[in-house]
């Protein structure tokens, strides 16, 4: 009986994420954020005329630019 309970405990620990980490979209794939990063962001910049560049990922605080999107749930950007 003790072995069964121990097995369930191990499976629970392995299957559950003990510390919540935010997951944000990137241009190519997903990014698991560090614990200090609380927001996902997306913003478009124009480094050259007619060549927009989209930046996406995790951040400590929300960008203040008017073309930036900031959110705090998984894959929201």
Swiss-Prot record:
GO cellular component: extracellular region
Cystine pairings recorded for this chain: 24-40, 33-58, 62-70, 71-76
Subcellular location: Secreted
A Pfam family hit: Toxin_cobra-type
Matching SUPFAM superfamilies: Snake toxin-like (SSF57302)
Site residues by UniProt (Key residue for inhibition of muscle alpha-1-beta-1-delta-epsilon (CHRNA1-CHRNB1-CHRND-CHRNE) nAChR): 44
UniProt note on tissues of expression: Expressed by the venom gland.
Signal sequence, renumbered to the chain: 1-21
Site (Key residue for inhibition of muscle alpha-1-beta-1-delta-epsilon (CHRNA1-CHRNB1-CHRND-CHRNE) and important residue for inhibition of neuronal alpha-3-beta-2/CHRNA3-CHRNB2 nAChR): 48
Residue numbers marked as site, Key residue for inhibition of muscle alpha-1-beta-1-delta-epsilon (CHRNA1-CHRNB1-CHRND-CHRNE) and important for inhibition of neuronal alpha-3-beta-2/CHRNA3-CHRNB2 nAChR: 46
InterPro entries reported for this sequence: Snake_3FTx, Snake_toxin-like_sf, Toxin_cobra-type
Keywords: Acetylcholine receptor inhibiting toxin, Disulfide bond, Ion channel impairing toxin, Neurotoxin, Postsynaptic neurotoxin, Secreted, Signal, Toxin
Annotated function: This three-finger toxin binds and inhibits the nicotinic acetylcholine receptor (nAChR).
Family named by the database record: Belongs to the three-finger toxin family. Short-chain subfamily.
Identification of the protein by name: Short neurotoxin OH-32
